[in-house]
UniProtKB/Swiss-Prot annotation:
GO annotation, cellular component aspect: chloroplast; ribonucleoprotein complex; ribosome
The organism's taxonomic lineage, starting at the top: Eukaryota, Viridiplantae, Streptophyta, Embryophyta, Tracheophyta
SMART domains named among the record's database cross-references: Ribosomal_S15 (SM01387)
Source species of the chain: Calycanthus floridus var. glaucus (Eastern sweetshrub)
Record-given protein name: Small ribosomal subunit protein uS15c
Family: Belongs to the universal ribosomal protein uS15 family.
GO MF annotation list: structural constituent of ribosome
Amino acid sequence: MVKNSFISVIPQEEKNKGSVEFQVFSFTNKIRKLTSHLELHRKDYSSQIGLRRILGKRQRLLAYLSKKNRVRYKELIDQLGIREPKTR
């Protein structure tokens, strides 16, 4: 399973499924699944709303992690292959 492959990559003390890194990883997987679903079903508006909601949650978690621990934030962004959000 995808979650188990990520858990083996992160350090032993961070195997907590409630950790910020794991939550961001989980949201990223959901985002990728919803994106591929929406490519086939463009008019699925409830899925679009769900995607926007998950994107917002992930963005808030990434902002929190970047404030608390910039090194872990950079590692996570590189590992997941997501862009750093634009700052205002």
